[in-house]
Amino acid sequence: APMLTISEEVQKRLQEKSYKIVDSVQVIGGCNVQWAHDPKTDRDIIIEINPRTSRSSALASKATGFPIALVSAMLAAGLTLADIPCGKYGTLDKYVPDADYVVIKFARWAFEKFKGVEDKLGTQMRAVGEVMSIGKTYKEAFQKAIRSLETGRYGLGHAKDFDTKSKEELLKMLITPSSERHFLMYEALRKGATVEELHDITKVKVWFLEQMKELVDEEEALIANKGALPADDALIAAKKNGFADKYLSQILEVPEQDIREKRIALGLEEAWEPVHVSGTQDKAYYYSTYNAEDKNPISEDKPKVMILGGGPNRIGQGIEFDYCCVHAALALKQLGFETIMVNCNPETVSTDYDTSDKLYFEPLTLEDVLSIYKKENPVGVIAQFGGQTPLNLAADLEKNGVKILGTAPAVIDLAEDRDLFREMMDKLEIPMPESGMAVNVDEALAIADKIGYPVMVRPSYVLGGRGMEVVYDPENLTKYMNAAVGVTPDRPILIDRFLNHALECEADAISDGTHAFVPAVMEHIELAGVHSGDSACIIPSRHISEENVKTIKEYTRKIAEEMGVKGLMNMQYAIENDKVYVLEANPRASRTVPLVSKVCGIRMVPLAIDIVTAELTGRKSPIADLKEKDIPYYGVKEAVFPFNMFQEVDPVLGPEMRSTGEVLGMSRYYGEAFFKAQEATKTELPLSGTVLISVCDKDKEEVVEVAKERNIPIRVGVNSGSLEKEILAKYDGHVTADGIVESAMDKVRIIEELNYDNIVVSIKSSDVMMCVKAHELLADKTGRLLHIHDLLHGHRKHLFGHIYAGNIQSPLSKNGRH
């Protein structure tokens, strides 16, 4: 926005038609009208109308400063547009958009989280988040959007291996729209493709392709002097066109710091322009540009604190962290600080102009954050509430003289360094699974051979289990290491012994550096190996012994105090054979902070703000006044998954997070709380149907015990071994066989012969990979995507077994059973 390639005549015509439609439908409030325009025939076709605020409403509000939802509420309450004041226009009915900047929305995808899915864009939405950027020109805004995505890219060139491909290969890859389309077009232009060729294939407007071609030509001219800093005029032009310091450093192969120092020496620094907010005065909402004079007055009335937001929503980092940032801003205001928010996500509350005293709609990169810090000179920056994004910046910010409030960046590094962390656990006499760090295949194989398979492997400094896998043998470990990207001595692969039959749990804590308070221990419902963000969890725990709960809280306090954590902290644990093991420490706000705050009735973020600002306010730590309390109800968190958008993907869960949201069910009865959570996910709950249970030999009797305990007659397809016959004989009258199968192929035959309308495949096995392979075979042969749920292990079956294997037509009673 604004429209750059649509004539004013067409824009006016579509606007007038939209007004007629809205008047005819008699919409009061926000409305979204979508059009298609054929530039060849000049024909307009209406696609759809949404008589409500929509996803684009939030984007439009942030792009224009026009508070659509607020105005919609006023109109719904009976006001008219002529009643609502609107700044220089007088009243809202006279408002005309007149922005003198360019706004770009760029979607964030997560295809890497869904193995086997084709990166293909179409009529069904597949983005999991988005960023918005603002610039004085299209080029400036577009390049700013790329570095806002936080995909490790700071410009359009040299993405993946695209620069090694020929022009013909790139043009072929462009035939199918994908999330990489812009990066492919950039490299195709570099390899000699013409604007006309790209237009013929992609149908992208020629003007946009010409803008991209100019960026390619400018980059090639810069690369001609690789190894040296660019000439003054070339650097000035590059910055005006949106080239980031980091990207210039990469393509020129010179240190980013040298680029920055030369730029500052030239007086080439970001200026700040306001986004005018309709109907309000003095709302401080700014964007950066190298193409205008600075119009950002600085106040000195109050001490300032800068909060770094979470960037774009994606799997592993979502609105849970925005919750923390918003509550941090509100708490800081109450303490008398001027709050400065930095974020680039239009979907969030943190980027509302009235959440903080001053909003910078900017990428969360070192260059952009340092520019804001230099401009505002705050007393400190808070990096612990925005997830992994600001944490990854914290160390570099500190090196550049930025005061980080709360937990020190060195503590963050300590938590990620498995060797140092293990030394600390040994000192505290806290058990931890055997582990190690590797930067190559040989090191990884040696570590795995020492600690034994299966092992859990993951990159360091990631969120959401990105790249995390359970590996069962040397062959697959070798494949994993060979495929790993960005592995360095500073960013090694972490390898831990996988606790195969463990019950996983976690605890959030508030710490002042010397004392810590743990409000709750959360019990994970899924088995070990499922990422904590994907697992349902319950507060308070149902099956962790009181002794182990005390142990977990004590371990958490000892670790927080030893590390000197100031603020929030999350600890992950596993319990195997009644022994508590530490899995990892996260000295920051976690995605469970909103959950614990709501279920336990504790204001975790404001309490953390009291602690991290104590050196500035002189206020005493609140930890001593916090007391544990009994919770007379249950809260169950359940994850929400996007498998409806990725129907070719097997929905089996694992150590890499794939959920995009979560819900909370609460009740005095734990079974009812769980059921509420399932309903809240909007996943269709089958009221009848057949359950096909596939388990390994050692678990078969246990599965039947679950069914028998619930008094549920079950029909099974069993193997023809002696164990199956013994089970059938032992539970005669309770278990009936629909067929005796010799192989996985025969299981498919049973499904086909019985013509099940609703199949739930319940798998519980210590060999997760075997289960996955069997399920894939069933799905392939039946042509259906089957839903997988883990049958709950051991003592946990009493809590939720009935949801998966029971007659869910029966109303839940007070004890949470049928």
Predicted segments — roles?
Residues 347, 410, 498, 696, ...:
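Active-site beta-loop-alpha junctions enriched in small/polar residues
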